[in-house]
Amino acid sequence: MERYMSLKKKISYSELIGSAKANELQTQLQAYVPGKDPNIVVEHEPSKNAAKELIRGDYRWGHQGDDKSETFQLTYSFLESEPDNMPWHITGFSAFNEEQRTAAKLSIQSWTDVANINFTETTDSDKAHITFGFFDASLTGSYAFAYLPSPESKQSGTWYNLKSRTFSENDIGVNGYGRQTFTHEIGHTLGLEHPAAYNASDKERPTYKKSATYFEDSRAYTVMSYFGEKNTRTDFKGIYSSAPLLNDISAIQEVYGANNTTRTDDTVYGFNSNTDRDFFTAKDENSKLLFTAWDAGGNDTFDFSGFTQDQRINLNEASFSDVGGLKGNVSIARGVTIENAIGGSGNDILIGNDAENILKGGAGDDIIYGGLGADQLWGGEGKDTFVYLSAKESPPLERDWIHDFVSGEDKIDVSLFDLGEAGKGGVKFVREFTGAVGEAVLRYDTVNKVNDFAINLGDKFSYDDFWVKIVGEPILESDFILA
């Protein structure tokens, strides 16, 4: 196993030799990755099985061999009176009011969005798989609790302390701690455990330092954790996730299968959202987003255009983005492709994935990096920098197109361009290719008003070389930052 740096020792990068913008991008590509991000203090080693730790006890409805292609059917009910089997250590039953029922249903929906399960409400609480109720006194000091299921289970209850202000109207809304608590306890009823063997009833209060057994045990990765997101470098500024996060989604799909019917059309997250989910929706510049995107198909967009802060938007699966003034508050579930991103009016960094991305920086001095795939790139207003790290990111048959480039303001940066062993001399402009590695040619099509920028990796120019199209007026060699 790869070893990580010891407690409270920061991890440094290898020395970067590119431009300031290229180095900033390179740093962002490694953000939130323990062992690579120098801002992370590693108190526990990362786990390659972090998601599976949530289902280590094999608690579930149904059996291990059940067909995950078939949707698992469950029922739930809100208790209207004290049940005969009310847990021994609590007293003072109360039923959920309408606002609390609505919030709990939204938490249920957030689980069915990602897993191949279906919940149906029933008024027959005796036969419901999962029940909801309040209490107002506990011999053990309970705040909220739920029962884990088993293949032979007939019912699992969730209970919440009504004396806690957490379950008032304000705190059960989106990003509230009460709403997260509903999502957390429902996670237990579906079979998810805490990331490690700790509980609120422990004699000694659990802490990240003493109780976590691996790095990812924080609320940045899972709603099942007791520990704040700052333990793993992210910062949500006091809000809480209303829906399953990165490792929750992987874990619940391992048990019941994935819901592959969720958001199969072209979906927009953030501003102009069509998700019909409050936690995916931004209404104005003061909105706070916190989510992991699970999306089963379509051509999808992260639209963070209404924010004014400097943002870091990464479209790669299992990555974290800094959106709307928070840190690491938006992530993408494993196996999910989000194709497009729109930045705001700050100085943003937009990072594409292997798909054919559309990236729009918006106002501000942005850094745009398409990665692999034939991308369409817009910098928007401001002094923007388009960074390339290798020829694979824009080969002749999958060329990127850069739009709205302004000569003298915007830059194309190849200062960290990988030319291999034969290209130690870097990238240099020439009139015509001679076959030498690193030769660059700039041409302008006066009819179509398109610039062509190409780099030769050796011998004749071929499919393995680099070629990008820049739309607009003629650009100059001085508009490039070379390796």
Curated annotation (Swiss-Prot):
Hemolysin-type calcium-binding repeats, residue ranges: 342-359, 360-377
NCBIfam families according to UniProt: Zn_serralysin
Top EC class for this record: hydrolase
Protein residues bound to Ca(2+) 2: G298, D300, T337, E339
InterPro entries on file: Hemolysin-typ_Ca-bd_CS (IPR018511), Hemolysn_Ca-bd (IPR001343), MetalloPept_cat_dom_sf (IPR024079), Pept_M10B (IPR016294), Peptidase_M10B_C (IPR013858), Peptidase_Metallo (IPR006026), Serralysin-like (IPR034033), Serralysin-like_metalloprot_C (IPR011049)
PROSITE patterns on file: HEMOLYSIN_CALCIUM, ZINC_PROTEASE
Active site: E185
Catalytic temperature dependence: Optimum temperature is 50 degrees Celsius. Active from 10 to 80 degrees Celsius.
Entry binding sites for Ca(2+) 1: R263, D266, D295, G297, D300
Organism: Photorhabdus sp. (strain Az29)
A Pfam match: Peptidase_M10_C
Recorded effect of pH on activity: Optimum pH is 9.0.
Binding residue positions for Zn(2+): H184, H188, H194
Keyword Transmembrane: no
Annotated localization: Secreted
Its EC number(s): 3.4.24.40
Regulation: Inhibited by 8 mM 1,10-phenanthroline and 10 mM EDTA, but not by PMSF.
GO cellular component: extracellular space
Protein family per UniProt: Belongs to the peptidase M10B family.
Name by which UniProt lists this protein: Serralysin
Reaction equations catalysed: Preferential cleavage of bonds with hydrophobic residues in P1'
Superkingdom as given in the UniProt entry: Bacteria
Principal location class: secreted
